[in-house]
Amino acid sequence: MSKVFSLSSGFSPAGDQPTAINQLLEGLDSGLAHQTLLGVTGSGKTFTIANVIAESNRPTFIMAPNKTLAAQLYGEMKEFFPDNAVEYFVSYYDYYQPEAYVPTTDTFIEKDASVNAHIEQMRLSATKALLERRDVIIIASVSAIYGLGDPDSYLKMMLHVRRGDMLNQRDILRRLAELQYTRNDVSFERGHFRVRGEVIDVFPAESEHDAIRIELFDDEVECINVFDPLTGAVLQKDLPRCTIYPKTHYVTPREKILEAIEKIKDELVVRRKQLMDSNKLVEEQRISQRTQFDIEMMNELGFCSGIENYSRYLSGREEGEPPPTLFDYLPADGLLIIDESHVTVSQIGAMYRGDRSRKENLVEYGFRLPSALDNRPMKFEEFASLAPQTIYVSATPGKYEIEQSGNDIAEQVVRPTGLLDPIIEVRPVATQVDDLLSEIRIREVKGERVLVTTLTKRMSEDLAEYLAEHNVKVRYLHSDIDTVERVEIIRDLRLGVFDVLVGINLLREGLDIPEVSLVAILDADKEGFLRSERSLIQTIGRAARNLEGRAILYGDKITGSMERAIFETNRRREKQALHNKKNGITPQGLNKKVGDILELGKPSSRSRTNKAAQLNRVAESKGTYVNLSPQQLELEIQRLETEMYDLAQNLEFEKAAEARDKIHTLRQQFIMNS
């Protein structure tokens, strides 16, 4: 099979990377279901995985534990594979309040959600890429295990148009309406179509820039063009065929909807009898009214609010069967990479239970039929049985990953840069704050940064206040600070706006700060979740990207977790030093641009570029939008869209195109903020 992935990098594998790459590839070729890449912080695990993807030549899912790390991986993979389909699949909700009922106060909470249109477009683009090509890398969060439209129904609903086909104009419009596209002859936006005589323009839901024009003559498809919806410029002329994908993943053919309605009616009869027999008259009246309304909507429009609660019938699955998810779109020979697996794996297991308890209340009190319980994320057992060949990636793999992998663990301890793991010291608790202050003074003079981790939010606030009183430039992180502000705080730390960052459990996975030379762990001898072996190794690893990396553990005794973490760090350090000595390597500090943490990858060389997008105007800085809040970004996007349409109406297309390119930049930034 010819290679479909093209890895673009100025580096070649070094350190432990070549050995790890070969071991993982051999495992995949021999059919191993589970492997683990145990890679220390800063050892280039992402580059190793990129090489494995390129060599294995298979469609790949990479699952990350949160949106921040998913965005970071998306940016890195876009740079490694500029000519391949690197897609982003995370939850498209900016805000989500699920349907719920609180029996104690008799309070029903309606579902309320705000959908991020740009991320919705990226999700649709991801499934389209999986259906059309093999050179696909999907960066996903745990939302990938939640129910998605059935791929068979999705494929059946696609509209194929070929040049020379005999198609009635009204039939095309009817099919577009079935795909949930909206006709709008005035404002032409994504997910809309417009009609001008026998010319039909469609703006595909999964497309960011390009629209399709279908020209008919006497019910024959005469010409198919791709054009820029803003300027009207034709980009590709006279295509032989085109495929229009549904506007949403949750579309269903008419005959399936009618079948589902009959099954819903049957279930409603059974449920009403159960409630009447239990003398639950209010619940019986409630479920009858709500379900009848949904049935009417589905009959007339083909969908209803909360249609996902009938997914069992719409996807043709039996009671208790797993819902269709993104994994159903992945080819049989696909590859799954689970990043930071010690966190991600446990998240996968937790999703089902939380969702179940909320829905049981809705069913019991007559807000939903029992079949709504099958609208759920996958159970962990279902995920495990459905997952393709899997590689777990972590500096501290969990018990599950190690058990599943057995002896198939690829160690990546030696860094390409020759950097060693931090030196660890244990110091008494009694003088920890004053001792820490003196260590901070030493780092301030050198222009280095310090991370401090405490046990409670109150402790972090008090410590930050104490350090500030002693003229230390300090900030603290805790769970109340949202993702965007957290990224900005980390960026300010790297830029030297302040020198010390105090936190609780946030200074761990994916925190890439080469300027940090000291990690201080207060009350390290308090055994528990925050001071477990895995947590300690992860936290110590934050200083592993600096030549002067050092970790101080404050404790009056050495706990089992401390002992194991110190032993493992020292073992790695000895192995790294031996490799450096053997190969004559001098350790080199990392020099990573500060802006990198917020970048989401460069556009592919295939994508249509515009000179106005590439060149910054006079006095326009590249990072203009980096520090804007999500609300400010949204307002700026709305302002620019209004300006763009006004310019287009005034026939000032060059200026309108500049505004469009600015909107594109803002939307890329918005992914990180969502």
UniProtKB/Swiss-Prot annotation:
Function: The UvrABC repair system catalyzes the recognition and processing of DNA lesions. A damage recognition complex composed of 2 UvrA and 2 UvrB subunits scans DNA for abnormalities. Upon binding of the UvrA(2)B(2) complex to a putative damaged site, the DNA wraps around one UvrB monomer. DNA wrap is dependent on ATP binding by UvrB and probably causes local melting of the DNA helix, facilitating insertion of UvrB beta-hairpin between the DNA strands. Then UvrB probes one DNA strand for the presence of a lesion.
Subunit structure: Forms a heterotetramer with UvrA during the search for lesions. Interacts with UvrC in an incision complex.
GO biological process: nucleotide-excision repair; SOS response
Protein name: UvrABC system protein B
Record comment regarding domains: The beta-hairpin motif is involved in DNA binding.
GO terms, molecular function: ATP binding; ATP hydrolysis activity; DNA binding; excinuclease ABC activity
Lineage, highest ranks first: Bacteria, Pseudomonadati, Pseudomonadota, Gammaproteobacteria, Vibrionales
Binding of ATP, residues: G39, V40, T41, G42, S43, G44, K45, T46
Residues annotated as domain Helicase C-terminal: 432-586
GO CC entries: cytoplasm; excinuclease repair complex
Natural source organism: Photobacterium profundum (strain SS9)
Similarity comment: family membership: Belongs to the UvrB family.
Keywords on record: ATP-binding, Cytoplasm, DNA damage, DNA excision, DNA repair, Excision nuclease, Nucleotide-binding, SOS response
Keyword DNA damage: yes
